């Protein structure tokens, strides 16, 4: 499968094209219409558990989500014929460099082969092409979750069969890196050295050197998160896998969904956990601080990989809204570089 990476000329970048942006998540689809850099309209289309329960797997939701998008555009007086292009969140495509890619039928067909661990982001390119084709306009994806620009030396693990690979929150991390370079450092991303820590239900940490994501700590490596196990000593993990206590499916559930705060405290809600800490729950504090400590270690490791030369450390994702989280991490890592809190997501 080959992808066509799109390089836009500077003149094209300055033109005011009208673009529909689609960001499918597990229980919602965020959409927005931009004209140049101006956002004309945005909304989040939320779906109930009952609405999604009838679908066997995520790719069966295509027609349902397409109809909700078309209705939202009509309800907000957005004429589809006024659009110049459609751009979507990129899903689990083969590993690729960061950038913008033209969606074609081959990419769409590939999404239907990703049954194991299929993610809602896989719907993005499918929806984009379905909506774009009748209009005669192009469809694109940007910075899919499989962006991998890792340096060769960083790929080497202690087992030849298991080279390290980059995966995670590429879209939001790169968007925040670009914003920080532009608005804070006032220089191109290509001239920056940044560490971006994404803090959400899952987390990942990425190192940017000269504009490239050259290394990362994934959400299934050793930093844990509200819904992610992260990692432990491999010997202990292997022993647990073969203990007969858990099935493969249950173990994979700990990796994403039932690990982290969920496993320790029975909830992934950070607001609830912080409330328990305020009320004197010492166990909740130990676990919560342990999670943040694991994130701090990831930042430190990537800083060392960059010879300690870092312009900014960026905290992003929903959990970065927490003053507790920002204060804990900033206190630990500000000796490396100034910390920029850019909470939330910038994925539209």
Model-based region annotation:
Residues 1-7:
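Short, small-residue-biased leader/transition segments that mark boundaries at the very start
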Residues 73-120, 138, 146-157:
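Short beta-strand-loop/turn "lid" adjacent to the catalytic site in phosphate-handling enzymes
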Residues 43-81, 107, 111-116:
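N-terminal phosphate-binding loop and adjacent alpha-helix
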Residues 253-308:
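Adenine-nucleotide phosphate-binding core of ATP-dependent small-molecule kinases
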Residues 19-60, 219:
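Short glycine-rich, Thr/Ser-proximal phosphate-binding strand/loop in the N-terminal lobe
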């Amino acid at each position: 499968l080959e992808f066509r990476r799109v390089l836009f000329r500077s003149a094209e970048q300055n033109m005011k094209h009208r673009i529909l942006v689609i960001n499918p998540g597990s229980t919602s689809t965020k959409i927005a219409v931009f004209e140049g850099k101006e956002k004309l309209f945005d909304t989040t289309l939320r779906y109930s558990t009952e609405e999604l329960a009838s679908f066997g797997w995520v790719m069966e939701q295509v027609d349902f989500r397409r109809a909700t998008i078309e209705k939202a555009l009509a309800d907000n007086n957005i004429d589809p014929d006024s659009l110049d292009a459609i751009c979507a969140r990129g899903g689990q495509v083969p590993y690729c460099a960061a950038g913008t890619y033209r969606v074609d039928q081959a990419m769409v067909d590939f999404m239907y082969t990703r049954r194991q661990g299929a993610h809602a982001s896989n719907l993005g390119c499918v929806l984009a092409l379905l909506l774009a084709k009748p209009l005669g306009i192009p469809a694109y994806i940007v910075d899919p979750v499989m962006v991998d620009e890792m340096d060769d030396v960083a790929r080497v693990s202690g087992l030849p069969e298991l080279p390290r690979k980059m995966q995670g929150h590429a879209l939001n991390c790169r968007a925040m890196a670009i914003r920080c370079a532009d608005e804070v450092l006032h220089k191109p991303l290509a001239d920056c050295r940044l560490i971006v820590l994404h803090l959400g239900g899952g987390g990942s940490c990425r190192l940017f050197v000269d504009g490239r994501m050259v290394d990362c700590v994934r959400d299934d490596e050793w930093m844990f998160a509200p819904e992610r196990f992260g990692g432990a000593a491999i010997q202990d993990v292997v022993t647990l896998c073969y203990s007969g206590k858990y099935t493969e499916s249950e173990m994979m559930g700990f990796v994403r969904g039932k690990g982290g705060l969920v496993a320790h405290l029975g909830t992934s809600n950070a607001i609830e956990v912080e409330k328990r800490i305020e009320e004197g729950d010492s166990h909740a504090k130990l676990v919560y601080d342990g999670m943040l400590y694991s994130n701090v270690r990831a930042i430190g490791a990537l800083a060392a990989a960059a010879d300690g030369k870092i312009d900014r450390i960026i905290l992003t994702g929903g959990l970065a809204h927490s003053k507790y989280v920002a204060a804990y991490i900033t206190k630990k890592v500000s000796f490396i570089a100034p910390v920029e809190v850019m909470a939330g997501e910038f994925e539209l």
